Amino acid sequence: RTEQNIIVWMDHRAIAQAERINATKHRVLDFVGGIISPEMQTPKLLWLKQHMPTTWANAGYLFDLPDFLTWRATQDATRSLCSTVCKWTYLGHEQRWDKSYFQQIGLEDVLEHDAAKIGSDVKMMGEPLGHGLTQRAASEMGLIAGTAVSVSIIDAHAGTLGTLGATGVSGEVADFNRRV
């Protein structure tokens, strides 16, 4: 089904697009370590636009997985500051997308309608979303409609948070403030 066309994180079809973006030396790249990886979203979006124009033209929203999951659960299209900064080039410290970057790389159309396709509402991880689980999502998961759902976090960051409470091999628990 075309509406479920998924490009996973490790997909490297966008190497040429990443190289083209890196050649711009745009200031946005300073916030992703100086170069963009083909595993990040803007090269993938550019690849999609160039190689699957019908899919591109028909795309409603473009999501990273954690934001898709929260949207699917709540129908709230709010994006995570974590995923948008880490993988989409959102300037979190300025709370905005850089229009000149998207224009320079040929993706200015994703900023139409207040960037609704990629995230016009970006919030901190853990903030509540919408009215919680929709009836449909709640039924599918065996939960109660309205159960709270929060803004997402990418897996690597969630894994780090999950290990902070773990004890070492010795069983000794370090002071939490020293582990953070």
For the regions a language model picked out, list residue spans one by one.
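Gly/Ser/Thr-rich active-site cleft segment
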Residues: 1, 6, 10-12, 23-154
